[in-house]
Amino acid sequence: MDTAAELEAIRRLKYAYFRTLDLKQFDDLGALLTEDVTASYEDGKTVLEGRDAIVTWLSAVLGDTGMVTEHHGHHPEITFTSDSTADGTWYLQDRVIVPAADLEIAGTAFYADRYRLTDEGWRIAHTGYTRVFEEHRTHSTLAVRSFRSRFDAPG
């Protein structure tokens, strides 16, 4: 096993997870998951099993184009548990902005992932996070002079 190449493949997998999440490309996000993937979001309040269930839930919770999300994964700690499995811990910094609700949520968390090497490459077999903190802010009082996103109507 070329450990450096496999580490890079897993890092790119998680980066793609965050990118497809923020761009609301849920079908593409689903392709990053194993079919039997499990997830534990919101400090274990939401536990899901299976690719379809996870993609459906993420789409329902984050798919509104009036909501913009920003997810950053930092400091990956990846440990190979075999030639075809690995565990990973990521430090998450995220933000959710909902201008119509005058709401901004910001926080940090630690993701705990399991990865499996499949015929298609590395895939996420489990993902979930535990919050370090989460704060809710009134978006309009943050001295924001203007706000626009890629999801706004042209014009």
Regions from the language model: what does each represent?
Residues 1-23, 27-31, 35:
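Short, low-complexity N-terminal intrinsically disordered segments enriched in polar/charged residues
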Residues 5, 46-49, 103:
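A structural signal for alpha-helical segments
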Residues 9, 25, 30-31, 46, ...:
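Low-complexity, compositionally biased segments
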Residues 26-92:
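A solvent-exposed, acidic/Ser-Thr-rich amphipathic alpha-helical stretch
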Residues 62-155:
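A beta-strand edge to alpha-helix "cap/lid" segment located at domain peripheries
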